[in-house]
Amino acid sequence: RVCFASMMQYDLDNGFPEHFLAGTPRVDNPFGKRLVEQGIKQFRLTETQKFPHVTFFYNGGYREPLDPKIEDYHLIPSDKVPTFADAPMMKASEIGKRAEEFIHSGAYGYGLINFANADMVGHTGNLEAAVQAVESVDQALGPMVEAVKAVNGFMVITADHGNADEMLTKNRVSGETEASTKHSLNPVPFLVYDPFYDGSYRLRDFAANQDLNLSHVA
């Protein structure tokens, strides 16, 4: 008799799989939940490749909104291509335009937006395509920044890991330079755009050797 078990239970909503080796870490107070408790209406926006990142992962392991009345999830279907090096712009433009609409609408107090380009195209190892991918995100961010300014808001730009920032690596065996298709271990940017900053808050100081991660953003 054979018993099949996964490394962990990856579908908490449906309790699947039934047999697993390690329990899933629980996140009892994800940031989205805090927003719901404050009654802040929010939108999540990305394309297919990163939809779980703005829903399942961001919610601490649950796919569905905690309160559908004030949480809107928006998905733009990704291009169906053999490799994203063939379409490095992906859906950055569409995501940017949709985000502008949501920001200008005045209906939301918070928005979570994920651009997939730098990661998905970075995985292809195609340097030229990666440059186009990053440029596409830059072009989408520009109008979003103006929209945020128009509604007296502020924006935080960051990432959970690098990829397109390091497209070449040295082969440990041959010593030759070759394409890198893996995540990098470099520190990621953390940018705050607040055109009306009045000194009412400041960024927390962390020790230089502290292991920082996304949980420190909020």
Model-identified regions with their sequence ranges:
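Feature captures the catalytic ectodomains and active-site-proximal regions of enzymes
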Residues: 1-218
